[in-house]
Amino acid sequence: MDRPETLHVDKPWGSFDQYALNTACTVKILTCGPGHRLSLQRHAHRDELWVALEDGAEVELDGKTMSPRKGEEIWLPRGSVHRLGCHASAGQPARILEISLGSFDENDIERLEDGYGRA
């Protein structure tokens, strides 16, 4: 699936950002505590768009590490190897808005590495 276009619309009262329109998707807010991280993982049946809700996140994507700023978007195509973490010095959890696109269930995850014994 191609990455959906993010639409920014200015209004007299402010603005809104639209991430999906009339698309089957699952929307979550991921919260990762300081010094913690999710499994290094990939998915076969879903693409994901992550939007940083505040600073402090650390994202690994296909061998590269980045620290997205609040509002920054990251596209995770199906099959990409990725993980979310939170810098130990962040002082607060990292939160990511996750929009998953595709036909899948929660078993659509291949854990490649996991600090909690689930790989």
Name each model feature, range by range:
Residues L30-G33, R42-V59, I99-G102:
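Short, conserved beta-strand element in jelly-roll/cupin
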